[in-house]
Design a protein with these regions (language model features):
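Mid/C-terminal beta-alpha module of Rossmann-like enzyme folds, strongest
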Residues: 2, 15-18, 220-276
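Glycine/proline-rich active-site loop of Rossmann-fold NAD(P)-dependent oxidoreductases
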Residues: 127-129, 155, 167, 178-191, ...
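NAD(P)H-binding glycine-rich loop region in Rossmannoid oxidoreductase-like domains
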Residues: 32-98, 102
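N-terminal Rossmann NAD(P)H-binding glycine-rich loop of SDR-like oxidoreductase domains
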Residues: 3-25
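Conserved Rossmann-fold NAD(P)-dependent oxidoreductase catalytic core, especially the SDR/UDP-sugar
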Residues: 80, 84-146
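Conserved beta-loop-beta element that borders a ligand/cofactor-binding pocket
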Residues: 114, 119-120, 156-180
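A conserved pocket-lining segment of Rossmann-fold NAD(P)-dependent short-chain dehydrogenase/reductase
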Residues: 140-146, 188-214
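Amphipathic terminal alpha-helices
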Residues: 303-314
Length: 314
């Protein structure tokens, strides 16, 4: 198939293109930077330069590629600072709203049969009831103020994509990325790894918040499966082992040669990081990958973050 990947040079876009090429697909990779043309060629993709917030430029790039499938992996996420979360995610929120609209319009004009978009699982689900959520569970109706606009952008993307009745619209709720090129990776050194080594990523309270992770290569392989035979709807793309912070954070510190994380009370975490840090440390729900494994026939290379942290950080 002809596959058009927007956000092609990001942490997920790069391994995704490699895997698509290995599967025999003809890939066009969209970037807004002229300087990344050669990188896309090296990955095996035909480069297309366009700004995702320019509807005419996106339309031209998609029309020229004539894809069967569009993959929306657009983000613009910098260094994570919970105190300035909305500011830091403002550009990504525009890509999840305006950028989504532009890609959908361009895809409709050429009649793509599938439209696969990046969504997000880690702090999106309602923080009540069971500790592991499926795609049928509701998203958070009262998120911390720091992420309210970002969660609304995620909800907008999912509604727009899965509600497009002219194509097979698929939203992939990825877990927390780790591995090469991510913030939890060693090549290059990710900012969260730097924080852990500097003991600036403490364990707050009892660390009962449950996180779901996914290795970046496994995220790419699940995306390939969705591109090839996914059906309309939402899929959690996470590993098999949701885990509380009290379990995974010390293991990650050990894996990267750091001292055990400091422990701080929740009131200090709230004071320095705001309500979001308290939620992430004590209230998050994990995600189930049962649907993705059943319907996509997908099996992660790293079923557990334990193995991934030990062998897959890069």
């Amino acid at each position: 198939m002809k596959v058009f990947v927007a956000g092609a040079t990001g942490a997920l876009g790069r391994p995704l293109i490699k895997q698509l090429v290995e599967h025999g697909h003809e890939v066009t990779g969209m970037t807004r930077s002229e300087s990344k043309r050669e990188l896309l060629r090296e990955l095996g993709a035909r480069p297309a330069v366009a700004d995702a917030l320019d509807p005419d430029g996106v339309a031209r790039a998609v029309a020229e590629a004539e894809p069967d499938v569009i993959v929306h992996q657009l983000t613009a996420i910098g260094e994570f600072n919970p105190r300035h979360f909305e500011r830091d995610f403002a550009a990504t929120n525009r890509l999840r709203t305006e950028g989504t609209d532009h890609l959908l319009a361009a895809g409709r004009a050429v009649g793509v049969k599938r439209f696969v978009a990046q969504s997000f699982a880690p702090w999106a689900y309602e923080r009540t009831g069971g500790m592991v959520k499926s795609e049928d569970d509701p998203l958070d109706s009262s998120p911390p103020g720091q992420v309210r606009t970002t969660l609304e952008a995620i909800k907008y993307l999912e509604r727009a994509v899965t509600g497009a009745d002219w194509t097979e619209g698929i939203a992939l709720r990825y877990g927390g990325f780790y591995g090469p090129g991510t913030s939890i990776g060693l090549s290059p050194l990710g900012d969260q790894i730097e924080m852990i080594r500097a003991r600036k990523f403490p364990l707050a309270g009892k660390g009962t918040g449950v996180w779901s992770f996914i290795h970046i290569e496994d995220a790419a392989s699940a995306t390939v499966e969705a591109i090839e035979h996914g059906t309309r709807g939402v899929y959690n793309i996470v590993d098999d082992k949701p885990a509380p912070v009290s379990e995974w954070l010390p293991e990650l510190a050990k894996a990267v040669g750091a001292k055990p994380p400091r422990r701080v009370p929740l009131f200090l975490a709230r004071l320095f990081g705001g309500e979001l840090v308290v939620v992430m440390m004590s209230e998050l729900r994990g995600s189930s990958n049962t649907k993705a494994k059943r319907e996509l026939g997908w099996k992660p290379r790293y079923p557990s973050w334990r193995d991934g942290f030990a062998r897959g950080l890069g």
